[in-house]
Structures are given as C-alpha cells and as structure tokens.
Amino acid sequence: MSIPKEIIFEEEAREFLLKGIKKLADVVAFTLGPKGRNVGLEKSWGAPTITNDGASIIRDIQLEDKYENMGVAMAKEVVQKIKEKCGDGTTSGALLLRSLVEAGIKNISSGASPIGIKRGMDKAVEVVVKAIEKAAIPVKTKQETRNVAVVSASGNQEIGELIAEAMEKVSNSGAITIEEGKGTETSIEVVKGMKFDRGYVSPYLCTNLEKMIVEMDHAQILLVDKKISSIHELLPVLQATAASGRELLIIAEDIDGDALSTLVVNKLRGTLKVAAVKAPGFGDRRKAMLQDIATLTAATVVSEELGISLKEIPATALGSAEKVTVTKESTTIVGGTGAQEDIAARIKQIDAEINLAQSSYDKEKLEERRAKLSGGVAVIRVGAATETEMKQKKQMFDDSLNSTKAALEEGIVPGGGVALLNASKTLGQLKLEGDEAVGAKIVLQACETPIKQIVQNTGFDGSVVLNEVLNSPANFGFNALTEKVEDLIAAGVIDPAKVIKNTLTYAASTAGIVLLSEALIADADDEEEENSTK
C-alpha cells in the first residue's frame, strides 16, 4: 500500500524552505572570520567535536519538521559542492544562500515574478564572477602562499607556516597529506609517494563514511593491466589477503561485473579490507604509469603481455605502502616500499624519453610522470594535547591546505568579503529592467553579507564599517585581526579567487531552485504518531 502524502503550496512552501536554510545558516554565521566562535557537536561516543568549520557543523544537522528539513538538505548540497570544489568557503556559501533566498521570497510575496528574479540573479552572478576572475592576482611567492594558508586557518600563524613549508618542499608536483600525530608537536616529513587523479570505483568501499574516503594502513597493492570482470580471477589474491589480515588496494584498467559486486559485499560484511581504483591514463600511457606505481611500491604489474596471470600470481608481485588514501576523485600512496635506486633509475629512464619526445604534448605528459615520481608526499603529523584539540587542528590544516591549493590554481583576491563587494560594484553596468533588475539588486545586497558578518563577529556594527569600506580604495577592507580598515593585500588578508566565485555560483544556483519551487510533497504524519505527541 502506498504511503499517503501531504502537499503544501506557493508561499507556504517557500517559507518552510527558507526557515530550514535560515536555521542552518544561523548556526554557522558566527564562525566566520578570524574572530569567529566555535560550535560543539555531540558524538554518540567519545569527546564532542569543537570546530568552526562550516561543512563539519552543517553535515549532521537534521531538523524535526520535514518541510524545513528540505531547506536544510538544499543548503547542505550547496555546502557539499563548495567543499568538493574548493575545500573552503562553506560558511560564506550558506550565508549567501540565506540572503538570496530571503530577499527573493520577500519580493515574490510583493508580486514579483520568480522567473524574472532568477533570470536577473543569473545575469548578475555571471558579471560578478567575471569581475572576480579579472581581479585575481597570481600567487608567486612563498609569503603569498603563507598568507592564504594563515587566513584559511582562522589567522593561525603556525598552521600557515607549516602548510607553506610543505608546499615548498614538494612543489606543485607532489602531494600533501594531513595525519594525526602521536605527540603534542606538529612535524613535517617528505616520504616516497605519489598522487594520481583516479578515485574509488564504488563509494561502498569507503572506510571513513564521515569524509567518504578510503583510508588504509600498511596496504598491499595489486597492479593489473587489464579489465577485471570475473571474481574467479581475483580469488587467489583475495584468499591470500584475507588469510594475512592485511588491506588490499587493487589498481586495474577497470573493475566491474561480479568482481566489483563481490568486493563490495565482502567489504560490507567485514570479510575483506579492500578498495579498487581505475589505473590512471589511457593506452600506452596507462601501462607506463602502472610501471611507475610498481617501481614506487615494489610491485610487479600483472600483464598477459609479460606472461603473468592473475590466477597464478606470485606472492612477490604485490607491492605495499605505509598509507593509502582514496577519495572520489584521487588516490594518494604514501611511503611506498620501492628501492630508492629503482626509483632513481625509473626517473632517469623518463628523462631520456623526454629528450627524445617529438611533440610538446608527449613531453608535457612525460614531465608530469617525472614530477609525480620525484615529488614525493609531504606528511604533516598534527600534534595536540587532547583528542578534541587534535580534531579541531586537523580540520584547520585541511581547510588551510585546500584554500592554498585553490589560490595556486586561480590566484588571490582581497579577503574579508571585500572581493565580492568590489566585484558587485560592476553590476551598475548591467542594464536590466523590471523583475530582472530586482534579481540583480538581490545579488548586490547578498555580496555585502560576508563582510558584514565578519565585522559583527569582531564586535563592531556591520553597516557602519561597510559604508567606510565602500568609500575606501579598491583593495581596502576590514582587517578583523587589527580591527581597522586598511589595504588587505598589503596586510596579507587574502582569499583564493576560486573559492569566492564558487561560493556565489553554487549559492545562487540553489537559491534559484528554491524561488521557483511552487509545492512541497512529503509523507503524511501517522495519526497514532500525532496523537502520541499531543
């Protein structure tokens, strides 16, 4: 029998969505900026998590009202998209969403057309994003890298210094991982390792469901230069792995069919500790990259061309690494057991191929391979006195690292909400009429939200300081640390352009969906449940 449904319409529906979004945004609002506060999250066991990271706070929020919860789900999607794309800016994204939806609903209630408002918002966002891209300054020095890292770590100088140092040690070619240390001191170590752009083949293989990643310690690594569809091919390896109790990472051309389904079922049952990813590259380049990974991990590539079969695989064919981390989009291998002389010989071979390369494309790809093999992985081991402090510091390191990477990709802009404010000034050039003009004005007002919130969290009047900033030169803004309006670029208060433009883009996209929503449908409350709550 189908479950009865409840339906609410138009203004009532939008108001419920807004209530959910506002509750969620209100929780994270006071965490914004270097003088933002913390939020405590109850855990079913152990110490509570104390954090000022918007994504961590928002992730577990579930409201009692089913319609408000739909609004929360929409806000969560914005935060998740920003987190995946940039790693930072989640709190600003939630505040922008609240501002856009609140102003949009207010105007719709006054008779404006939702479609016209959305069209105007889309045009305004496009103009603001282009202005941010135009204003972006490339990151060239270690000091600029450090400044971005410090700002993203809520002004923590130690974290900024360590992230900048790690970046310098491995350059753009290497990878950086953040781990929990065993003492109170935080340290950096560069180890043999590699990162490549291939994620897990199934999310059901994740070991850390909170972050949706696979984490393995002292894992064995199987490299296969073909597609695996039948579980029978893998049985000898899986039986040996299960007997040893070690974790296994499979890197193959592809894994599907009953091979994948059996791996997933056994992983969920706890019978096997296994993960699988597709091999990086295509064709001959894939074969070469598999050989690079084999050199790094002391493995042998299982290939029919070499006369090695999966069914009769020698024990020595499996490589190993101290730590493996697999996300939705990438795989990082840390501490491979390959001999240093073998890695050096492999790099020398790639150098020879670079010298012989005819096309610039081939040369570029070979240089990428060389960089991955020689760059290594910088491991930052975070030290803290308590578990609660450890979790908070590790989260700050993660945010700082993600922001710094974003800054290196697309450049920096003045921080403290000033980049959005400056970019929104270009909306005066946009000649719109009617409801489209209303939509553009809503975006203009939303762009003032982050700076006003940062000022309020510092203990000042947001509107008063905003007026002072609007009458100041282009890069001037409110520095929450010094509590005065000054040149933020010169003061080192900077944000990654990529983060700023994506927070606005994703917030506006979801706001448009909310404004165009005319009805909400949910399961009807059970009569017995209603009576029991009375």
Curated annotation (Swiss-Prot):
This protein's UniProt keywords: ATP-binding, Chaperone, Cytoplasm, Isomerase, Nucleotide-binding
Main location: cytoplasm
GO BP term, pick one: protein refolding
Broadest EC class assigned to this enzyme: isomerase
Catalysed reactions listed for this entry: ATP + H2O + a folded polypeptide = ADP + phosphate + an unfolded polypeptide
Entry's Gene Ontology molecular function annotations: ATP binding; ATP-dependent protein folding chaperone; isomerase activity; unfolded protein binding
InterPro entries: Cpn60/GroEL, Cpn60/GroEL/TCP-1, GroEL-like_apical_dom_sf, GROEL-like_equatorial_sf, TCP-1-like_intermed_sf
Cellular localization per UniProt: Cytoplasm
GO cellular component, one term: cytoplasm
Binding site for ATP: T31, L32, G33, P34, G416, N479, A480, L481, D495
Key word Calcium present: no
Catalytic activity, EC: 5.6.1.7
Pfam families: Cpn60_TCP1 (PF00118)
Binding partners and assembly: Forms a cylinder of 14 subunits composed of two heptameric rings stacked back-to-back. Interacts with the co-chaperonin GroES.
Family as reported in the entry's similarity comment: Belongs to the chaperonin (HSP60) family.
Purpose: Together with its co-chaperonin GroES, plays an essential role in assisting protein folding. The GroEL-GroES system forms a nano-cage that allows encapsulation of the non-native substrate proteins and provides a physical environment optimized to promote and accelerate protein folding.
The protein's name in its UniProt record: Chaperonin GroEL 3
UniProt source species: Protochlamydia amoebophila (strain UWE25)
